Amino acid sequence: MIPITTPVGNFKVWTKRFGTNPKIKVLLLHGGPAMTHEYMECFETFFQREGFEFYEYDQLGSYYSDQPTDEKLWNIDRFVDEVEQVRKAIHADKENFYVLGNSWGGILAMEYALKYQQNLKGLIVANMMASAPEYVKYAEVLSKQMKPEVLAEVRAIEAKKDYANPRYTELLFPNYYAQHICRLKEWPDALNRSLKHVNSTVYTLMQGPSELGMSSDARLAKWDIKNRLHEIATPTLMIGARYDTMDPKAMEEQSKLVQKGRYLYCPNGSHLAMWDDQKVFMDGVIKFIKDVDTKSFN
């Protein structure tokens, strides 16, 4: 457990180190907010095979870390500061520190790069657009692919804010999540554990009750750093996927908006392409890290 200082007190966050490699240290940032590291266990086989040093990590508020209840903690700047404290604790620096963020973890990774890129060697943003309003617009596009009667029932439940209604999940799972979150017929145990352990209080406060866009009153709803991506000079990999909840064309555009970007497209993947288009995803991530490490990235 790593001690973390915050404006409302001191807490501890859970991390687990794999391997020892002074040249490559990768910190994995999970999504949610307030999911867990568990769904990112898929990196273990691939990164260990390459000899990378990497860290699974539960952000503050997540299941394996402390879960304070002060709502002042749940904002981007505070999470960015937490990542910087974790970096120091794992003795990573601009010569070896790679951040890989998926979904909300991608928001955190981009925001970290904007504030602390002097400490960063490589940035990997998996399946996260740089604008929450644009993401919400794309969710509208995808939601219209659902059967009209299904969408009508989903919207009716949302209008009543009856999110605890089991019917809400019953509708979203086969009609949206199985298409756009993870397309494997059977969801991996690691992903199911992560879902079971989500801190729904933090998740709902920051993003809303489901993966179908964001609530207009969620703390992340107006988040948009697209016009700041040009400030990021760290070598960056943006990952998009055909069936993702995030527009793959936006992910490609983001790779051109940063100063040194590369785009990885997963033609069979969704939001968790690390699982459902695994070979393409992992091969691309590993190549990026090796290219940056050997100074052959361009």
From Swiss-Prot:
Domain AB hydrolase-1: from-to ranges: 26-277
Molecular functions (GO terms): aminopeptidase activity
Keyword Hydrolase: yes
Any one of the GO BP annotations: proteolysis
pH dependence: Optimum pH 8.0.
Reaction catalysed by this enzyme: Release of N-terminal proline from a peptide
Active-site positions on this chain: S103 (nucleophile), D244, H271 (proton donor)
Superkingdom of origin: Bacteria
SUPFAM superfamilies hit by this protein: alpha/beta-Hydrolases
InterPro entries linked: AB_hydrolase_1 (IPR000073), AB_hydrolase_fold (IPR029058), AB_hydrolase_sf (IPR050266), Peptidase_S33 (IPR002410), Pro_imino_pep (IPR005945)
Thermal properties: Maximum activity at 42 degrees Celsius. Stable at temperatures up to 44 degrees Celsius, showing 50% of activity after incubation at this temperature for 15 minutes (at pH 8.0).
Alphabetical UniProt keywords: Aminopeptidase, Hydrolase, Protease
EC number(s) per entry: 3.4.11.5
Biological function: Releases the N-terminal proline from various substrates. Cleaves specifically Pro-betaNA and small peptides containing proline at the amino terminal. No activity against hydroxyproline-betaNA.
Complex and partners: Monomer.
Family statement drawn from the similarity comment of this UniProt entry: Belongs to the peptidase S33 family.
Protein name: Proline iminopeptidase
Gene name tied to this protein: fpaP
